[in-house]
Design a protein with these regions (language model features):
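Acidic, negatively charged sequence tracts
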Residues: 1-195
Length: 195
């Protein structure tokens, strides 16, 4: 994990932010317990590299004015057309305090389901967790090939270590396996009924 170099900024206008984005910089805000909001800028390429290695909800090391710290990537805003990062929110991590974050669910075994003429309907792709900063996973893998037609997968089915607590309702549905033919015929019947 590299140390990202944040540059403190004073200018708060949107005109300034657009100018900086054209120059390859991303504006951002840093906040947290006992820290007043701090506006900064960072190189887009440098930030993109770090996000690709830590994930969109990971922990980064950064330095500002020569001091090193850790922060949680709280929010990344992207341009809807170019998908370039246009703003980033960082939350300062104080020591080894427990943090809350969203972690992507990585579904494994989808090709097994499609080979059997079924489809995986994903209801959720993120799970909210609570843990120590050093224990935050980049993603949580979930093998759906164990299920069959009609299977419903819930947050309670996710396998996480004792050090990680799931904050979402454990009865909540994250995915289900449906019959593709049945689903398309139901959609066809709905379209006929609408006409």
């Amino acid at each position: 994990m590299n140390n990202l170099n944040l540059v403190k900024r004073e200018n708060k206008t949107s005109h300034w932010a657009k100018k900086e984005r054209r120059a390859g910089k991303v504006p951002g805000v840093l906040y947290g317990k006992g820290v007043s909001n701090l506006l900064f800028e960072i190189g887009e390429l440098e930030l993109s590299r770090e996000i690709s290695s830590t994930g969109e909800h990971g922990i980064i090391n950064y330095s500002i004015e020569g001091e090193g710290h850790k922060a949680l990537l709280r929010e990344i805003q992207r341009d809807p057309v170019t998908h370039k990062i246009i703003h980033v929110d960082l939350e300062e991590i104080a020591g080894n305090d427990t943090i809350q974050s969203e972690v992507p669910i990585q579904f494994v075994g989808e090709e097994w389901i499609s080979k059997r003429g079924a489809i995986l309907q994903k209801e959720q792709e993120l799970v909210r967790v609570s843990c120590k900063p050093d224990e935050l996973p980049k993603s949580i893998k979930f093998d759906v090939s164990k299920g069959g037609l009609g299977s419903v997968f819930r947050y309670s089915d996710l396998e996480v270590g004792e050090e990680i607590s799931i904050l979402d309702d454990i009865k909540g549905v994250i995915a289900s396996i449906s019959n593709e033919k049945k689903l398309t015929s139901e959609l066809g019947e709905e379209e006929k009924a609408d006409n």
